[in-house]
Amino acid sequence: MHNSGGQSGWNLSGEERKPFSNYGRNNQQRRSSGGGGRGSHSQNRAANGNWPDAGSEGGQNGNAFNKFRDPQQELDNHQPNKRGGRRNRGGGGGGGGWGGRRGNRGRDSNRRGGRNNSWQPKDQHVSPGQSNMLYFDNVGDFTEDPPLPRSSPAPSSLRQESLPPVTFAADLTPPPPVSVAPPDVAVTPEEPTVPLINIKKEKEMEHKSKIKQFVKAEPKSPKKKKVNSSRSSSTSGEESEPEPGEMVVNTKAVVVPSPKAKAIKTPVASTPKPKAVKPVSSSDSSTSDSDTDDEQSHPPAKSKKMEKNTEEDVVCMGSQERQFTITDEEESTEPEDDKKARKQKNKGKTVDVCGICDKKGHTSFQCQMICRNCSGSYHGLKNCPNPPNLNIAIQSFVEFAMQQMTAFHCEQGFGFPAGTVTAPVSAKPKKDKKASIKKIKKSSQKRMKVEPKDHDEEDDEEDDDEDEDDSSESDDSESSEEPHPAPVSKQKRKRGTKASVSAAASLPPQVFPFPLLGAPGAPFNSMMYSYRAPFNFSK
């Protein structure tokens, strides 16, 4: 390291470092502002020789970066005075990451007695790219060597090294099933599955550069099978064995008849690589590959047929007259059903039957509509044949409103029957009010008088037996007093009720110029329902 020159004078033990801790933090601030002499921390750290370790901690201990500090890291590092002074050398908040060079050179100069000015020109030797990389990467307590593999470019390079074998494996494994396809194209044309089609498309995309279209030549296939059967007889007698052998022969044969490719549209990817990779495989793998490829090879043909059918359906659906029938049943997609639906639609224009009035020529929706101009039944004409008569507009509206009110009873708070009379409570005569007030006052006074007598009786009974006669007399007096107010109050109540009833009866029946709205038995009023010349007020 660069520090080796000045360590002799400043190689302090752990005990000597502790008193410098606070001083070092002050130096940290001093250096950041451009002042400050020899920093105790920089020199103490030189004795350690563990710069990236110290840097990560010291830089992160600045005022701005205490938030992001991990407290456990502080506990793990047994060098308390690492914290000061590192931030200034790294510049900015995370100075710990500036690697070893910048900080160490600065500290060397400090150790030799130089001022801070001595390490400014040495900073110029460090390119900003290096400093930025190390600033982001050096995070934990490490010696000078470990942070380099931890830096961000290193793992990406490692990943790039690990990726190529994966891509090779991906390239090597898929082609063999693709090349097995040619002999079995005509064997199993059924079982289309969508995911296999997608797989086939992906494989074709991978090998586009080497794809060549292949002709089904049926007479050639038995010859190939004869050639391969001799090979397969040595391994096993199963029928599925010749297929992997065919793969090798087919790849050779496919390369030759490339001019015939445009005759039949069954593209099959054929590459020379599979020969070296997979000369002859086990019967199980070959059968599975052949099955999958059969399924892969044929669905495109069926999908084309399906596309044709769908196109035909779309063409049949619409005509120039733009008559579409939207039905929930799936059967309507068939052309016969479409024709029937069209015939019904053509008839429907003339034979619409209303579900409300059972009349032909309009729908139930039109039957509910009203002309907004003449308020007549819906006629669907741009120019209304019945212009509105403004002379009877108000009266017609009032008639409509009254009909609505008679049909729909509104809340009882607004509508009263014709024979209702106001409640008598609101029309009390003054005498009744005075009597009620007097009653309240008298009753309260009597209750107040009775209560102390009762207390006196209880005290007399407890103290002396001679006063029993007095108590009995008082009881008698109370009993004699109690029955008197009751009939008085009853009589007054009777009088009040009689007066109220008589007052209500004496009132003449209320007369309303118009029948109450919402009255169930409202009589017919010629003013409201006049089917004659409009009413004119006399001037």
From Swiss-Prot:
InterPro entries: Znf_CCHC, Znf_CCHC_sf
Gene Ontology biological process terms from the UniProt entry: adult walking behavior; learning; mushroom body development; olfactory learning; ribosomal small subunit biogenesis; visual behavior
One term of GO molecular function: zinc ion binding
Annotated phenotype, changing S332A: Minor reduction of in vitro phosphorylation by CkIIalpha
Compositional bias of kind Acidic residues: 327-336, 456-480
Zinc finger feature spans (CCHC-type): 354-367, 371-386
Biased composition (Basic and acidic residues): 67-79, 199-208
Name recorded for this polypeptide: Protein mushroom body miniature
UniProt feature, compositional bias: Low complexity: 268-289
Effect on the protein upon substituting T292A: Strongly reduced in vitro phosphorylation by CkIIalpha
Bias (Polar residues) ranges: 1-11
Modified residues (Phosphoserine): S288, S290, S332
Effect listed in the UniProt record for changing S288A: Strongly reduced in vitro phosphorylation by CkIIalpha
Effects seen without this gene: Lethality around pupal formation with rare escapers with a delayed eclosion time. Reduced size of neuroblasts and ganglion mother cells with no effect on cell size in wing imaginal disks. Grossly reduced mushroom bodies with degeneration of Kenyon cells.
One of the record's GO cellular component terms: nucleolus
Biased composition (Basic residues): 80-89, 428-447
Phosphothreonine: residues carrying this PTM: T292, T327, T333
Function: Required for small ribosomal subunit biogenesis in neuroblasts. Plays a role in mushroom body development.
Organism of derivation: Drosophila melanogaster
Top-level division of the source organism's lineage: Eukaryota
Keywords: Cytoplasm, Metal-binding, Nucleus, Phosphoprotein, Repeat, Zinc, Zinc-finger
Subcellular location: Nucleus, Nucleolus; Cytoplasm
Tissue specificity field: Shows widespread expression in third instar larval brain with no apparent difference between males and females (at protein level). Detected at low levels in the mushroom body neuropil and is also expressed in many cells of the brain outside the mushroom body (at protein level). Not detected in third instar larval brain cells in anaphase (at protein level).
Region span, Disordered: 1-345, 421-513
Biased composition (Gly residues): 90-101
Free-text description of this protein's post-translational modifications in UniProt: May be phosphorylated in vivo by CkIIalpha. mbm and CkIIalpha colocalize to the nucleolus and mbm is phosphorylated in vitro by CkIIalpha.
